[in-house]
């Protein structure tokens, strides 16, 4: 048997290193697996693989392997320079366990290829016939050492290549670390923005839910109010359709007419009050301007008083804003007068319908009419009167709202110069009527819960 790594020569003249010695599958006898020398590489037949089974590996996985029967090869007579054989996978993985080396380490390591090969050249000239057994042993030892040197050199080159690769990876990692930090920061900002948007969405859902609940509650209240009003109207209609007497109908119409006239008188009184307030305001402003011009102390006190606003009464008499305010009050008063006249016209029209009903009653006394036809006529007349009354109530309501707005727009300074007696009377009246005061009609005849303007007239029931 030839030792592994020894140089063997085939009978055909090819030389190579012994990589395998033993049996080959599906072959009889003992075979020697050789990795041919570079000068005989063209005669190679395989890469150390036979029938799919790998027996050895060739350098760079080249096709330089050959299997020869043991009896057709012999030990080479001389030593020649041989290429660095390819080590197996276990030897190639040795370099991965070394620690990182500095970039200058590769240049500082001496290359084994620089060693002079004069000893090899001189040994090639030694004839195999002139070697003694001791020299043959030494020759074998030299061949083994050369083979080990080639393996070590190859391992060192692979380690240096691995170091270079690791250094490039470290450099790339340092370059990419900044990008990774930037990406992490952007991800953090995105997460904060997403959390903020989620909080805003939750708040909006809560507000929307609260608004929906408020709307539902308001809708339920309005529905309940309308249902109660509809029930009252249906009850009134049933009472009218069941055969209510003509006298009762006429009496209710007269009461409604009186109520409308009362409302007209109240509105007329309000118009007169506004006119008086306007006259008192102009007189008070003249007195106030005279007092301010005559007394500097009073002027300073008036400006320092927190109760006096900066309305139109604080301005001089010939100031454009003051004149504009007075003109506005005059326009409002004219509008109220027109509405009062319109209400008076509606009241006259209602009187006409009442007189017409009285005539029809007188005529019915002489010429009786069937009860069904009479009730239908009364129902039609009643519907007309109800529509007229609703229009009148709507007009009164609008007039009341406008009057309240006018009272809100008036400056508090207009009422500062009223007499003490009028203030006390108003305070006593408001105190007496506090329990039964209607904010819509501004009267003490009934409370807000019993207001006919809002819930309809109680006389209809």
Curated annotation (Swiss-Prot):
Residue numbers bearing the Phosphoserine modification: 82, 84, 289, 294, 305
Gene Ontology terms: biological process: cytoplasmic microtubule organization; establishment of cell polarity; establishment of mitotic spindle orientation; microtubule cytoskeleton organization; protein localization to cytoplasmic microtubule plus-end
Compartment(s) where it occurs, according to its Swiss-Prot or TrEMBL record: Cytoplasm, Cytoskeleton
Domain of life: Eukaryota
Positions of the UniProt region annotated as Disordered: 278-323, 417-437
Subunit structure: Monomer. Interacts with tea1 and tea2. Interacts with tea4 in the presence of tea1.
Function of the molecule: Has a role in stabilizing and targeting the growing tips of the microtubules along the long axis of the cell, directing them to the ends of the cell. Acts as a cargo for tea2.
Name of this protein: Tip elongation protein 1
Annotated organism of origin: Schizosaccharomyces pombe (strain 972 / ATCC 24843) (Fission yeast)
